[in-house]
């Protein structure tokens, strides 16, 4: 049997064909290990310019969740909440008991209470995993994040580490720096009104978010955000998910101001005859 295998086994050319894909794989691993896929700016910083988008159901609930009915049952399947594995490391946000009770209250009436429903700015990190693309525009001194939802935006100050926020705001105050090939952004001074998702996950005005953007492929970033808020959480916690570059031809951020879609929701009761029988 041993002689038969030697005599009639694969020819050298067959071995060469098997080896070729292996060499490609090993070459790819080598490139990835060397970080050669990381694009560079003119000053050799990692280049994050582009239009990016998250894929998933984290905008419904960042914790693991089953599929559920929509609060508007008339919408049927198209309004149903999709299941999700969650993006919170460890699976659960470490709330205080009072803060968890507040989250449950929020969730029970999210359609009336979620600020995003009324087109308020989503805040950070929520803006990153809404089902809308966003654009990163990078220069040596600033990084601009332009979000399609509500035309929200923020400026990351790369050259002013001591610049304090003059006021609290919906998108907070962002200061950034590089740690090796990662873009790290410190976000503070957000108003306490923003939520983290439609499930009512929340924070106070003491929230501090440390974001980290890292290239893990030519068209993929890994996004991490560590949240600290001693008024709401018992310890710091991290959420993590990939962002994908939008490669659509002529891809651009389009207008979705959304205010015009909420006017009736917010001001409809003031319309003449609105309460008429």
Language-model features, listed with the residues they occupy:
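Bacterial N-terminal signal peptides
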Residues: 15-28
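Intrinsic disorder/low-complexity segments, especially N-terminal tails and targeting/processing regions
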Residues: 8, 26-27, 31
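N-terminal secretory signal peptides that target proteins for export/translocation
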Residues: 1-15
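PEST-like low-complexity, intrinsically disordered acidic/proline/serine-rich tracts
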Residues: 2-3, 30-277
């Amino acid at each position: 049997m041993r002689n038969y295998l030697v005599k009639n086994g694969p020819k050298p050319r067959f071995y060469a064909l098997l080896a070729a894909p292996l060499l490609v794989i090993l070459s790819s691993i080598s490139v990835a290990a060397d970080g050669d896929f990381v694009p560079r700016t003119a000053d050799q910083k990692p280049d994050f310019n582009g239009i990016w988008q998250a894929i998933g159901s984290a905008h419904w609930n960042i914790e693991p969740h089953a599929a559920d009915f929509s609060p508007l049952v008339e919408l049927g399947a198209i309004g149903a909440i999709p299941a999700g594995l969650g993006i919170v490391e460890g699976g659960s946000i470490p709330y205080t008991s009072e803060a968890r009770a507040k989250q449950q209250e929020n969730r029970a009436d999210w359609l009336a209470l979620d600020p995003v429903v009324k087109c308020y700015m989503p805040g950070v990190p929520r803006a990153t995993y809404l089902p809308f693309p966003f654009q990163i525009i990078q220069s040596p001194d600033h990084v601009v994040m332009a979000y399609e939802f509500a035309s929200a935006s923020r400026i990351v100050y790369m050259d002013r580490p001591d610049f304090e926020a003059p006021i609290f705001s919906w998108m907070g105050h962002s200061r950034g720096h590089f740690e090796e090939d990662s873009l790290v952004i410190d976000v503070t001074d957000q108003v306490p009104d923003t939520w983290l998702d439609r499930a009512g996950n929340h924070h106070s005005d003491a929230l501090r978010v440390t974001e980290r953007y890292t290239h893990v492929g030519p068209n993929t970033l890994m996004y991490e955000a560590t949240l600290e808020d001693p008024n709401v959480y018992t310890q710091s916690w991290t959420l993590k998910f990939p962002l994908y570059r939008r490669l659509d031809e002529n891809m651009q951020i389009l207008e979705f101001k959304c205010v015009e879609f909420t006017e009736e929701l917010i001001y409809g009761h003031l319309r003449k005859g609105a309460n008429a029988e």
